[in-house]
């Protein structure tokens, strides 16, 4: 919840409050005797910082794609940090393919098509 609150505060341009939420997380997780060193200032709070903090805190919880899509950073960050995928990532990857079983199950198939860029559209 602190990461969500920090992002909301940043979006409201309340960087001081957003940084405090991040610092609360870091005080909880920091090594004794070094917690103060882990704190950030409001000037360091950016969406990229929050995304990096979310990756550290939520690694393995399968939230990364949603975070990058929601913040409109998916293409930028894949191109920057994943050299193997850099040449393959395309604008249409912002949407995922709709499972074929879902497309087969709809009654009015002419109204529901596969997302652009994936087979069947």
List each model region and its residues:
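Long, intrinsically disordered, low-complexity segments
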Residues: 26, 37-121
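Extended, hydrophobic/aromatic-rich amphipathic alpha-helical segments that build helical scaffolds
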Residues: 1-25, 47-57
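Boundary/linker segments of alpha-helical solenoid repeat arrays
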Residues: 32-36
